[in-house]
Amino acid sequence: MDAILNYRSEDTEDYYTLLGCDELSSVEQILAEFKVRALECHPDKHPENPKAVETFQKLQKAKEILTNEESRARYDHWRRSQMSMPFQQWEALNDSVKTSMHWVVRGKKDLMLEESDKTHTTKMENEECNEQRERKKEELASTAEKTEQKEPKPLEKSVSPQNSDSSGFADVNGWHLRFRWSKDAPSELLRKFRNYEI
């Protein structure tokens, strides 16, 4: 209880400050900052400094907590709640105890930039897809108009009206003449389809 009452936040407890990162930093940024700091204060480079080992261990612990999604979420919750106890002690508490503590938690920092690169590239890809769809619709409309112009007019019945049995037969045979495949050069749309460009 005395530890909680006499608790003072130390800079070593703030893992983001220790690594020189921000709470919005990605895992890659955290790892890059860790490597830089670890090279600066590695115990092998400073054997005469007794605090080098302690500092390096703190850096490793900060890296382990901040690169793991679950532990980072717990750390961020603890940090924003401004609990007056060390993070290790907070971690040791049972989940039921944590939920019974009704502390107001500050919200996460807002992003300085509105969109990330991924969001921007996704929007650009969607716009390109929409443009391609519009082009395809226009091509389909133009090819449909061309086929309507080329399509022969329906054949008149070549069978005399006297022979009623053969008129049905003539319609069946004439069907393929009305809806036959065009022997013209394939359209641009058909070429793209065959080459898997669509």
UniProtKB/Swiss-Prot annotation:
What pathology is it implicated in? Hyperphenylalaninemia, mild, non-BH4-deficient: An autosomal recessive disorder characterized by increased serum phenylalanine, normal BH4 metabolism, and highly variable neurologic defects, including movement abnormalities and intellectual disability.
Q: Does the keyword Cytoplasm apply?
A: yes
Q: Where is the J domain?
A: 14-79
Does Acetylation show up as a keyword for this record? yes
Keywords per UniProt: Acetylation, Chaperone, Cytoplasm, Disease variant, Phosphoprotein
Expression triggers: Up-regulated by ER stress.
**Record text on subunit structure and interactions:** Interacts with HSPA8. Interacts with TPH1. Interacts with TPH2.
Q: Which SUPFAM superfamilies match?
A: Chaperone J-domain
Check the record and name the Gene3D superfamilies matching this protein.
DnaJ domain (1.10.287.110)
Region annotated Disordered, chain positions: 114-169
Q: What does this protein do?
A: Probable co-chaperone that participates in the proper folding of biopterin-dependent aromatic amino acid hydroxylases, which include phenylalanine-4-hydroxylase (PAH), tyrosine 3-monooxygenase (TH) and peripheral and neuronal tryptophan hydroxylases (TPH1 and TPH2).
Protein name stated in the entry: DnaJ homolog subfamily C member 12
Basic and acidic residues bias spans: 114-156
According to the UniProt entry, the coiled-coil residues are none
PTM Phosphoserine: list the residues.
Answer: S160, S166, S182
Q: Which residues are annotated as modified residue N-acetylmethionine in the UniProt record? A: M1
Q: In which tissues is it expressed?
A: Expressed at high levels in brain, heart, and testis, and at reduced levels in kidney and stomach.
The Gene Ontology CC terms held by the record are: cytoplasm
